[in-house]
Amino acid sequence: GTGLDALHKAIPERFFDVGIAEEHAVLLAAGMATGGKLPVCAIYSTFLQRAYDPIIHDVCLQNLPVTFCLDRAGLSPNDGPTHHGLFDISYLRCIPNGIIMQPKDEDELQDMMTTGIESKCPAFIRYPRGEGVGVERKKNPIPLEVGKAEVLRKGSLCAIWAIGDFVQIALSIANQFKKKYGIEITVVNAR
């Protein structure tokens, strides 16, 4: 489901599939981090809820360097309501030591992966189901400054703050306002 088959084939000795045991996945990643590794743990956003206790006590309170990739964040209509990842931002924001990120495109996803791994603390990267928007990716991802938004377009009347795939929608709205009303709208990628 998470599309990691190619990664499993490329590095089978570094790939662990725990099945539908999200608590175990988080605890395994915590154990690896305690042992000096920098694990990346891929879980559907909605099913990360099952591992809330180990996320708090075994990863975040210990400030362990685990990077979580939360697939199907937001609405996931083709999978049905049980797979909508709607609550992760609200329940992760109240946990100390973690970073929550959501890329606007696949290039920024690479930057966020680098940021998560290099930050040496719990990092949560959420993204929707499906393919990216088709932007060209850098050969060498660049770590992002944590907590700093990206101003994509400057205006004077108002601003639209967006995150993830909604950044493209915000840019489209800003373009429509410019075309129809001659109004420049600021668009900010909250990241």
Give the ranges of each region predicted by the language model.
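Thiamine diphosphate
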Residues: 1-124, 131, ...
